[in-house]
Amino acid sequence: MATGKIVQIIGAVVDVEFPQSEVPSVYDALNVTDSKERLVLEVQQQLGGGVVRCIVMGSSDGLRRGVEVVNTGAPISVPVGTKTLGRIMNVLGDAIDERGEIGAEEVYSIHREAPSYEEQSNETALLETGVKVIDLVCPFAKGGKIGLFGGAGVGKTVNMMELINNIALQHSGLSVFAGVGERTREGNDFYYEMQEAGVVNVENPEESKVAMVYGQMNEPPGNRLRVALTGLTMAERFRDEGRDVLLFVDNIYRYTLAGTEVSALLGRMPSAVGYQPTLAEEMGVLQERITSTKQGSITSVQAVYVPADDLTDPSPATTFAHLDATVVLNRNIAAMGLYPAIDPLDSTSRQLDPLVVGQDHYDTARGVQQTLQRYKELKDIIAILGMDELSEEDKQVVSRARKIERFLTQPYHVAEVFTGDPGVYVPLKETLRGFKGLLAGEYDDIPEQAFMYCGTIDDAIENAKKL
């Protein structure tokens, strides 16, 4: 084992000098010997003269020059397999739930090659979520990549929690949750909610359905930069066993942000809006590994924070290129009190194709979008001249569009504690039946209030009787 000495410390970036003949490779993990807690450095660059520049996987507080560092000769490796289920781990795969060591028989390096083209699967199957607006307008594919786009406070995490609740329980597959740079409180709430739902079994962790990897907001950038890869590595192991895995990443923007934080310290010139010049490559390395093979599938749902609600920002724009479906959350819809605040006009999916979902579903979804788009165009006229100036046909469009807007809302299981309304899971055929009826004018006589926060169309009819 080669040993070196720390020669420079600048925040999250540390330079280590090794003998010329024993310089570590890029991505090698180095252990700091003097640290009270386990402290790992990951080599990023070889500067010449035996000096390597590293990112600290932890806090560099208290480190000093001259401290000895040992090269492990391999990249960071994390435990994989069933022992990780029901446990909370950090970026290095160490348990942080105070329930003892993970004790896994197998470890994988977090830096792995993406599956080759021959290994990848090309089958298409839909994944029902039970959320009306998603199943109708932007259906998910099994083994696809889904992005939840939204600014601060419009409901990305709540939507993700509901998807975990609906898909993990209905689909009964295994899930890996990677909390990348998000709030510690949300991670804590998630853990206890999963216990209540029976997804995490504290008494017998290996019967759990989810493994959790956290690198929260208060962690140094090295942890936030690599924690997504740690979660993905665990998901890949389950996939290679022939399982269908769900990978939830909250939030992929913080992964980019951590890269931005260390990029300048590594001596790279910033590019547009101050992002790292390697933004597209870093995103590609992560996203290309999230794929389905002939053995099993990884379906990933990623929350994407949109800075200042600007979808053209380089970070969300780079993420867009990799996704099969995009769920866009709109602040204006949230301001109207319509939740989930998913924009049916901005949200897209490659699966919304007559050859995949069928002609009936496709026509219904496009009919809903057409009605809502026409209403959007008429809003200016209504604001200036009022409803009376519209033709009878346009008045009917407005009436139906307002009902559709309200019928797209739905009570969530994970929001029951706030709203007091029990959550509902709406099967796809019920969703289609309701919207087909609305477009055909079958429910023109029902007041629009009846459609607020109901499940199926039958619930709306019941609500109308109470009004």
From Swiss-Prot:
Class of enzymatic activity (EC top level): translocase
Reaction equation(s) it catalyzes: ATP + H2O + 4 H(+)(in) = ADP + phosphate + 5 H(+)(out)
GO CC term (a single one): plasma membrane
List of residues binding ATP: 150-157
CDD domains on file: ATP-synt_F1_beta_C, ATP-synt_F1_beta_N, F1-ATPase_beta_CD
Entry keywords, A to Z: ATP synthesis, ATP-binding, Cell inner membrane, Cell membrane, CF(1), Hydrogen ion transport, Ion transport, Membrane, Nucleotide-binding, Translocase, Transport
One GO molecular-function entry: proton-transporting ATP synthase activity, rotational mechanism
Enzyme Commission code(s) on record: 7.1.2.2
Pfam families: ATP-synt_ab, ATP-synt_ab_N, ATP-synt_VA_C
SMART domains: AAA (SM00382)
Membrane topology annotation: Peripheral membrane protein
Subcellular localization: Cell inner membrane
SUPFAM superfamilies in the cross-refs: C-terminal domain of alpha and beta subunits of F1 ATP synthase (SSF47917), N-terminal domain of alpha and beta subunits of F1 ATP synthase (SSF50615), P-loop containing nucleoside triphosphate hydrolases (SSF52540)
Family: Belongs to the ATPase alpha/beta chains family.
Cited NCBIfam families: atpD
Function recorded in the entry: Produces ATP from ADP in the presence of a proton gradient across the membrane. The catalytic sites are hosted primarily by the beta subunits.
PANTHER family: ATP SYNTHASE, ATP SYNTHASE SUBUNIT BETA, MITOCHONDRIAL
Name recorded for this polypeptide: ATP synthase subunit beta 1
The organism's taxonomic lineage, starting at the top: Bacteria, Pseudomonadati, Pseudomonadota, Gammaproteobacteria, Vibrionales
Gene: atpD1
